[in-house]
């Protein structure tokens, strides 16, 4: 039986480039463990160029990346308008894309648009699901209008930010807030703010990453929860995981980039989270509701905050969850009796299923007949 060819894409130009490599290693091993697929790897360098498969294999093996990229760039025809994606031709045809590009390109819908243009199946949400979910402000608007509980927030740009003094923020949202770049992931461009000086610095930092910034209320006594969701029309939800960070060190009591990807030794993980049956049911239902409202497919991780009264608030979705050894998403499915190999096999099947379903849709056009207009008369 001929094995289907899976194009595993990793790297990218975001701050999560190195995280993507570690996720891709685990996905590669899981796909290989199924024994069902041939894997072709493509790294996207930090300059945005797809690298050929041989160079990509070296980068996946964590060889020193820059010399590999430099050598590849010497082979690039700079006059080719498609030079950035030209390397995709180097491996011949393949059956499905498996993107593992965190942050920009992978989670904002860019790659999914390319896959759709190439008329190829791919793992994960469609372009619009990624694009909407990557924009924290737009996500919160959709959650709110659909009755899915989330925290109070304000959205500002560089001009309107001048209208929101620290005193005004405190009156509206309380004296502890989080300032976040609207279009970034994994705690990049996020600051916990407790005074006017920190507020000014946080805005300046977040505006380095996006021209739209979210200012969000803090949740009193918050426990951070995570839930995995996989599937298409009838998605499955994992057990709920919880993590707590001591109020010390770089994290200041919240789950920041360092705690997620650099050193999680101080983080306490709890799988499954010790919650009442009522709260467990509510969190899982909110996760499923958000998955559908945001038009997600394939996979996602839903992050929640649980306040001191055990009321859950949906924080934000992650449409391409990390799959490193430190990632809770990976561990949640392990606990739910879906091991890595089974999980990736299901994700690939969901990708083929969604592609086949979309092929049934009609994209007909209306002819304008022989009428000629403008300069073409």
From Swiss-Prot:
Its cofactor is Mg(2+); Mn(2+). ATP binds at residues 170-225. One of its GO terms (biological process) is peptidoglycan biosynthetic process. Its EC number is 6.3.2.4. One of its GO terms (cellular component) is cytosol. It is found in: Cytoplasm. Residues 140-349 form the ATP-grasp domain. Keywords: ATP-binding, Cell shape, Cell wall biogenesis/degradation, Cytoplasm, Ligase, Magnesium, Manganese, Metal-binding, Nucleotide-binding, Peptidoglycan synthesis. Mg(2+) 2 binds at residues 316, 318. It catalyses: 2 D-alanine + ATP = D-alanyl-D-alanine + ADP + phosphate + H(+). Binds 2 magnesium or manganese ions per subunit. The keyword Cell wall biogenesis/degradation applies. GO terms for molecular function: ATP binding; D-alanine-D-alanine ligase activity; metal ion binding. It is an enzyme of class 6 (ligase). Mg(2+) 1 binds at residues 303, 316. It comes from the Bacteria. Pathway: Cell wall biogenesis; peptidoglycan biosynthesis. InterPro entries: ATP-grasp, ATP_grasp_subdomain_1, D-Ala_lig_Van_CS, D_ala_D_ala, Dala_Dala_lig_C, Dala_Dala_lig_N, PreATP-grasp_dom_sf. HAMAP family: Dala_Dala_lig. Belongs to the D-alanine--D-alanine ligase family. Cell wall formation. This is D-alanine--D-alanine ligase. It comes from Leuconostoc mesenteroides subsp. mesenteroides (strain ATCC 8293 / DSM 20343 / BCRC 11652 / CCM 1803 / JCM 6124 / NCDO 523 / NBRC 100496 / NCIMB 8023 / NCTC 12954 / NRRL B-1118 / 37Y).
């Amino acid at each position: 039986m001929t094995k289907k060819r899976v194009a595993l894409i990793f790297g990218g130009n975001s701050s999560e480039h190195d995280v993507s490599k570690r996720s891709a290693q685990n996905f590669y091993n899981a796909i290989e463990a199924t024994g069902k697929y041939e894997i072709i790897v493509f790294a996207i360098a930090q300059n945005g160029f797809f690298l050929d498969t041989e160079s990509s294999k070296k980068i996946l093996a964590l060889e020193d990346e820059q010399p590999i990229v430099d050598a590849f760039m010497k082979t690039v025809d700079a006059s080719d308008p498609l030079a950035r994606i030209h390397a995709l031709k180097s491996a011949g045809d393949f059956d499905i894309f498996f993107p593992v590009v965190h942050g920009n390109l992978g989670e904002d819908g860019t790659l999914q648009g390319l896959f759709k243009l190439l008329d190829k199946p791919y793992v994960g949400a469609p372009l619009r699901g990624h694009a909407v979910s990557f924009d924290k402000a737009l996500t919160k608007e959709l959650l709110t209008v659909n009755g899915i509980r989330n925290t109070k927030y304000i959205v500002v740009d560089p001009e309107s930010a001048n209208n929101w003094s620290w005193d005004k923020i405190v009156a509206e949202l309380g004296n502890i807030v989080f300032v976040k770049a609207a279009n970034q992931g994994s705690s990049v461009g996020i600051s916990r703010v407790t005074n006017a000086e920190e507020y000014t610095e946080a805005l300046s930092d977040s505006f380095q990453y996006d021209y739209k910034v979210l200012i969000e209320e803090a949740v009193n006594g918050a426990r951070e929860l995570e839930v995995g969701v996989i599937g298409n029309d009838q998605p499955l939800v994992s057990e709920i995981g919880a993590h707590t960070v001591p109020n010390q060190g770089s994290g200041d009591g919240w789950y920041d980039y360092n705690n997620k990807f650099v050193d999680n030794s101080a983080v306490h993980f709890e799988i499954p989270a010790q919650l009442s049956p009522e709260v467990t049911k509510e969190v899982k239902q909110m996760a499923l509701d958000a998955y559908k409202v945001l038009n997600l497919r394939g996979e996602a991780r839903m992050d929640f905050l649980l306040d001191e009264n055990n009321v859950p608030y949906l924080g934000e979705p992650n449409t391409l969850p990390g799959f490193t050894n430190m990632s809770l998403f990976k561990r949640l499915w392990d606990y739910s009796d879906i091991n890595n190999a089974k999980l990736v096999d299901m994700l690939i099947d969901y990708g083929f299923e969604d592609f086949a379903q979309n092929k049934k849709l009609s994209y007909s056009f209306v002819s304008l007949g022989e009428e000629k207009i403008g300069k073409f008369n």
